[in-house]
C-alpha cells in the first residue's frame, strides 16, 4: 500500500463493528447527580484524551460554563492514547481521567482485561442506553461510507461491487485511512472476514462466476487483492473526502470516510455522493468512553461522561449528518 501525507442507517449493509467486542467489567458510582456535581466541582478539573478535537473546541467550554469544572482536552490517535494510558497506569503517575477511544479490539484485549480502564455508565441515564452499548460504554456511533465524485460520474457510483476496487482500472484510485493509524479500518477488514459469505455472493452476482480463493476465506481474499491494487492511504478522513470530492477531476477516486464529511460539499464546494455498492455500503463505527484506572479526578470524569451523553454535551457530534449518540432519547 502507498502512504500519502495519505446499521442503523443502511441496516443490511453497514457492518456493525461493535459486534466484534466482548463485554468488559462494569464500573459504577453511588452518587446522586447533585452529589456528583458537588464532588466534581471540588476536584475542579478533568483531563481527557479524545479521538476528536470537538472535545477541546466545543465541549470543554460549555461544560466549564455549566458546572465550573475545567476540561483539559488533548486530541490523540488511538495508538498514542493506548501507549500513554498503559504507561501512566503502570508507573502510577496517572494524568488523564477520561478517554474517548475508537479501538474496540485493543480495549477488549488489553486495556480492560489488564485493568487499565474502568467502565462507567451514568446511572441517571442507564435506561436510555441500550444494553449492547453499555459494556463497554459506547457514547457515539459514526457511519463510514464508500463515496464518489458526482461531478465526475453523475448520479450513479462508478462501481456496483466492492470487488471492482481490486481491478486494474481502480489501481491507485481507492483512498482510505491508513490501517496503521485508524483502527476502524482493521476492524472493517476483520468484520469482512466474518461476513465472507456476503463477499462470495457479491462476487458471483457481479462477475457471474464463483470466486476462486487463494486465502482461507473471501474476507482475506478481498483484503489481499485490495492491498495489491495500491490503495492510497491517509492520516485523516477529511483529506480523503477532499481527494474524492474535489471538482474538475477526470478520473476521481473512490474513498471511504465518515458520512459527516458530506457537510464539506457546502463548506468546500465538493461533489461527494454515496456509493450504492454491494455487499456493504460502509461500516458503523462505535466510539467508547472509559475512565482510566487511578484517575486523579474520578468524579469530574463521571460528570463529564454523563454530560457527553446528554443533548447539550452530544450536540458537537450528533449535530453532524449521520452521527448519533448511544442515548436513545436524543435527537441526531
Task: State where each predicted segment sits.
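Extracytoplasmic ligand-binding site segments that recognize negatively charged/polar headgroups
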Residues: 49-60, 72-86, 94-245
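Mature extracytoplasmic/periplasmic domains
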Residues: 282, 287-332
